[in-house]
Curated annotation (Swiss-Prot):
Organism the protein comes from: Herpetosiphon aurantiacus (strain ATCC 23779 / DSM 785 / 114-95)
Protein name per its UniProtKB record: Phenylalanine--tRNA ligase alpha subunit
GO biological process: phenylalanyl-tRNA aminoacylation
Subcellular location as annotated: Cytoplasm
GO molecular function: ATP binding; magnesium ion binding; phenylalanine-tRNA ligase activity; tRNA binding
Catalysed transformations (reactions): tRNA(Phe) + L-phenylalanine + ATP = L-phenylalanyl-tRNA(Phe) + AMP + diphosphate + H(+)
Enzyme Commission code: 6.1.1.20
GO CC annotation, single: cytoplasm
């Protein structure tokens, strides 16, 4: 039995000397000092010894086990240190290599134009209000001087939303103009100077010039003795700030049911200088927004007496402004999520 222990010690030590990795050490431990290893199996034969030899056998067994355990611990520490050193070498960073710039996000071009518009009007004393996208037919049409069956309703192809109330029609707003009524009824009887940006929806075929969803910025000014001159001065100042300082502005008569008189506002084409080109369709002018003096009926519906109060309103699209500034010929680019297009507006 003692010879068996000596043989195990000799072979285990030789095997341990050939261990080169932590995986090899784990295999060695299983074979020699583990619960089912050679040393454990040798200890089971102690019952076959003469009782007087058992203490000596146990002492010898313990000495061998302790010696192998100490050698194993020493080797394990050395292998772990070597493995850590190798890992650090493999993960070392070469500081002489050129750095890689962070991938920085960009604002959507519509967002850029919207923020620019808001900034310009904020410096003119306008507040920014937000209004609901789902509106009643009353606010979207009737209170804006378009009662049921009014022919002006045909100017907007409308999405109707199912309503729990059969007596109330609910729509996705076709313009931001319903916000005028909400603002007037909230601030009445105070003067008003606000812009209302937001999304609008129209049941139109998607094309290079139209989308079913688009953004719009509504403007509303209510006060005493507000005139067409105030409208022209405000919008001319906006055009100069938005496009260029010496831009020429013209006002063409138009029609909107909620303003009277109504105008379309154009600027001289800054691409061709008014000579006529593809962008301005050879006219020399670019349409940028619609505007007009608030209709007396709309004032009354908002809680203001048109005999005492007056005001003007205007509406524009951030996508339209962006298309003009950057010569973009298809509005669908704004909603295509094409990185090649969006990254041009960083």
């Amino acid at each position: 039995m003692f010879e068996q222990l000596d043989q195990i010690e000799k072979e285990a030590a030789a095997a341990l000397a050939s261990v080169q990795s932590l995986d090899d050490l784990a295999a060695w431990r299983t074979q020699w000092t583990g619960k089912k290893g050679a040393l454990a199996q040798a200890s089971q034969s102690i019952g076959k010894l003469d009782p007087k030899d058992r203490p000596a056998f146990g002492q010898r067994f313990g000495a061998i086990k302790q010696a192998l355990s100490e050698q194993e611990t020493t080797l394990e520490a050395r292998l772990q240190s070597a493995a850590l050193h190798q890992e650090l070498e493999e993960d070392a960073v070469d500081i002489s290599l050129p750095g890689r710039a962070a991938n920085i996000g960009r604002l959507h071009p519509s967002t850029q134009s919207l923020r620019r518009i808001q900034h310009i009007f904020a410096e003119m004393g306008f507040q920014v209000w937000e209004s609901r996208e789902v509106e009643s037919d009353e606010y979207n049409f009737e209170l804006l001087n378009m009662p049921a069956h009014h022919p002006a309703r045909d100017m907007w192809d409308t999405f109707y939303v199912q309503s729990d109330d059969p007596h109330q029609k609910v729509v996705l707003r076709t313009h931001t103009s319903p916000g005028q009524i909400h603002v007037m009824r909230t601030l009445n009887p105070e003067p008003i100077r606000v812009i209302l940006p937001g999304k609008c929806y129209r049941y139109e075929p998607v094309s290079a010039r139209s989308e079913m969803m688009f953004h719009q910025v509504e403007g509303l000014v209510i006060g005493k003795n507000i005139t067409m001159a105030d409208l022209k001065g405000t919008l001319a100042n906006f055009a100069r700030r938005m496009f260029k300082d010496d831009v020429k502005v013209r006002y063409r008569p138009s029609y909107f049911p909620f303003t009277e008189p109504s105008v379309e506002v154009d600027i001289e084409c800054f691409i061709c200088g008014g000579e006529g080109c593809r962008i301005c369709k050879k006219s020399g002018w670019l349409e940028i927004l619609g505007a007009g003096m608030v209709h007396p009926t709309v004032l009354r519906n908002g809680g203001y007496d048109p005999a005492e109060w007056s005001g003007f309103a205007f509406g524009m699209g951030p996508e339209r402004q962006t298309m003009l500034r950057y010569d973009i010929d298809d509005i669908r680019w704004f909603f295509s999520n094409d990185g090649r297009f969006l990254e041009q507006f960083g």
